[in-house]
Amino acid sequence: MRLNGAPYNNAELKRIAGYVMQSDLLNGCLTVEETLMYTARLRLPRTFTNAERKQRVDEVMADLGLSHVHDVIVGTPLKKGISGGERKRVCVGMQLLNRPQLLFLDEPTSGLDSVTALDLLRTFHVLAHGKSEAKAVTIVCSIHQPQAKIFNLFDSLIVLKAGSIIYQGPRKQAMVGISISFLNCSILIPFSFLSYT
């Protein structure tokens, strides 16, 4: 296995990659900005000043559409806070503070309604294609049965069925590659015809 053309190195992967879990583990009593500042203090190099940390947090909040809720608490089951989509964005922001080259997301749309899920994936699409070279990040995410609009945001796919790869390659060629194996393929919702039992 190789990473950036060199033999795989776990320390190098940790340096260049971020990982966002399906379930968030956020402190519901902190605001969005406090959560990101706390993470910045823990994860950014010690050479960063408080002003530089604050600038990075502000950039991440702007990139993820969180600036308008910077002073809203994350929330708890007993105290209302930000929405589920915003919680997911905060989790992503915590990983983006380091400006990773590679970001893994486990089921980022889980628990979100279709509109919020689409909005979140559109944000990921913008991040992946980068406003600048320094901010561009390769995003790898696992998603079960994406709606057609979400499916069309992906560049490349690996499609699994019963633990086996049935397609790997560009999204634009996926329907041709898979229709060879499956005749009842829906064009509107590309992978809804696959059985996951």
Language model segments and positions:
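Catalytic Walker B motif of ABC-type/P-loop ATPase nucleotide-binding domains
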Residues: L103-E107
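Conserved ABC ATPase "signature" region
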Residues: M37, E52-I73
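Q-loop/switch helix immediately C-terminal to the Walker
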Residues: R15-Y19, S23, G28-P45, R56-E59
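Conserved ABC transporter NBD signature motif
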Residues: M1-P7, L13-R15, G75-P77
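A short, proline-enriched helix->beta-strand linker immediately N-terminal to the Walker B motif
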Residues: L96-Q101
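Helical segment within the ABC ATPase nucleotide-binding domain
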Residues: A117-K135
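Hydrophobic anchor residue at the start of the ABC signature
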Residues: C91-G93, L120
